[in-house]
Amino acid sequence: MFDLPRAAPLDMADSWLTFQAEEEQGQESFSSSVNLDDSLTSLQWLQEFSILNSNEGKTPSSSGDSHGYRQLSGAPCSPLAADPACLGMPHTPGKPISSSTSRASHLGLQPMEEIDYKTNPHVKPPYSYATLICMAMQASKKTKITLSAIYNWITDNFCYFRHADPTWQNSIRHNLSLNKCFMKVPREKDEPGKGGFWKIDPQYADRLINGAMKKRRLPPVQIHPAFASAQAAASSDSKRGSAWQMSVNSESHQLLKAFEEITNEQGWNPLGEHGWNSISDGKSHKRKQPLPKRMFKAPRLSSSPMLSQEEQTELGSLKGDFDWEVIFDSSINGFNFSAFEDLEVTPPLSPVTRSVDLTVHGKHIDCPQQWYPMGQDHAVAQNSLDFDETLLATSFLQHPWEENRNDYLSNSANIEQLFDLNEAFPAELNDWSSLGSYI
């Protein structure tokens, strides 16, 4: 095992410290030799920038430049201030280049009450053209005024219109022509000059003078008295109709209540033990007794055009009292409906019958067997379409047809069966042409 000298570690430490000192000196000399560009701005302020603190007081700068302008030492309050091209430039507003900017500056500097429109050419007066026309007419103290007088008064009292585009005169003419508040007065023959006069309509004078009509508005809608009375009558009819409907509903409710009481007294309830309420309350109650079946079918009456108007109205609406004994067929079901014996019902109308005359040139033709009704019930249950076809065939047989006429009967009926031509006429007369000459 070898023994190292004690002086070796001390020498190594001294040399290490010397190396560190030389390295630090080299870095300082390098940083001093390299000149960094001051125009390169750090973007770290973007992360800390906020609109809320942008209006806070600026920190005073420690030094000024040669021009005497102040430079910000802290973070700039806007990206424009951090631009190298903007460094050293005064941040003051420049000269306005448009008339709108000058108008805004004048409006911002002067209050609205202190603006003199007669001498200020930059501010437009806050009045509508209709108001300007009304002011000119009032200032003239005359019943009528010309268009040129209106122009002169506006230019004399408002400096803005003296320097503005003359298109405002077109707006004045349009307001005079289209606004209901102004009316034109024709010039008389003995009056000198050209053109007509203008004046304020007395109907709208108060509203226009008070400033209620600064803009063109249509007159209020006036309802004619005849239409107003018609609307009042319609509203009264609707009220009467609603009252009549309420009375009808109350009467029907009373009728149903009376019927339920009568059926309960007789010991028969068609809707179960819960009565009429079991229909609406279907979830909690169930019918214990089914409804009675219909034991007969009501005959369908034909809507024949031969019925009179009174009979048709009787068919359309039920008149008289109901015969509950017939409806519920008490004789079959075995129930006693003595309470309904006093009720009467109108008997059904008998079918319309008509004697048909089937005589052609003195020869009688018997009606087919199917034309005769089998009974009263059969006649009542006949369909209206079959009855109309019967009338059509009857009217056709009453009038002789022409020689070359093709009709319903000639296409569907057999001539030999109707007239028995095989027995009465020879074989050569069975043709249509010879038949016409024979008749």
Swiss-Prot record:
Source superkingdom: Eukaryota
Name assigned to this protein: Forkhead box protein J1-A
InterPro entries: FH_FOXJ1, Fork_head_dom, FOXJ1, TF_fork_head_CS_1, TF_fork_head_CS_2, WH-like_DNA-bd_sf, WH_DNA-bd_sf
Subcellular compartments: Nucleus
Entries under SMART domains matching the protein: FH (SM00339)
Biological role: Key transcription factor required for motile ciliogenesis. Activates genes essential for motile cilia formation and function. Required for ciliogenesis in multiciliated cells.
GO biological process, one term: regulation of transcription by RNA polymerase II
Known DNA-binding region: 124-218
Region (Disordered): 273-293
Family statement drawn from the similarity comment of this UniProt entry: Belongs to the FOXJ1 family.
